[in-house]
Amino acid sequence: MPELPEVETVRRGLKALVLGQEIVAVTLKVPKMVKTDLETFALTLPGQIIQSVGRRGKYLLIDLGQLVLVSHLRMEGKYLLFPDEVPDNKHFHVFFELKNGSTLVYQDVRKFGTFDLIAKSQLSAFFAKRKLGPEPKKETFKLKTFEAVLLSSKKTIKPHLLDQTLVAGLGNIYVDEVLWAAKVHPETASSRLNKAEIKRLHDETIRILALGIEKGGSTVRTYRNTLGADGTMQDYLQVYGQTGKPCPRCGQAIVKLKVGGRGTHICPKCQKKRP
């Protein structure tokens, strides 16, 4: 958490709140969050104007013209905008003071979030180095490529979907939902999937992540959008967090198990494990 739908919702909120604003000062309380040169980060950001707010997978891209501030929220990161005085909070770690008098604050209970300030010309190389897969859209997420990679891999399907190389943006919540919708057991070896299963995984990834965006993300644990509001996708989750409840498709009780060290929710009847 947050996954692609939540990050996209944050992106839209940031765009509505800070587009066109000039950064006049930056205060950084947790230096380890910045993965590029600290001095450059502190000295370069003041005077920059936020020209657009984009997203690639789970990364937010704050476009400053020739530079891009790449923000990864990791487990608990979120942005808040205060029009005047900023309240004390030990979890507020980065403060972007804006020319209109407001302050954009990055909050992160776990302190896992990261910032990279890079030249826009280096953005493609930045993501290539991380082997980030395509966006989950029909135009970019090609079935034939997805199929070829899966059938040549010995990885288990759930960890494979989570590693961001097949497709960008899936996390634990949405992988469980995709696997249930596609009727695939999470411990199935990628290479043992048949073509019909692969097509279902492909199509359901696109559909479910789009639904997550439409519903403003899933509010489980601490997620809120930039405007402080909850998402509603949690009301549409079929298996994640539904342990003991009847499967919406067949009525069998949803069970929780561990796959690749991650809590995983499945229907044991709809998602049969291969012998």
UniProtKB/Swiss-Prot annotation:
GO biological process terms on file: base-excision repair
E.C. designation(s): 3.2.2.23, 4.2.99.18
Pfam families: Fapy_DNA_glyco, H2TH, zf-FPG_IleRS
Binding site for DNA: H91, R110
HAMAP family, per the entry: Fapy_DNA_glycosyl (MF_00103)
Subunit structure: Monomer.
NCBIfam families xrefs: fpg (TIGR00577), PRK01103.1 (NF002211)
Designated name of the protein: Formamidopyrimidine-DNA glycosylase
Organism field: Streptococcus pyogenes serotype M6 (strain ATCC BAA-946 / MGAS10394)
Lineage: Bacteria, Bacillati, Bacillota, Bacilli, Lactobacillales
Gene field: mutM
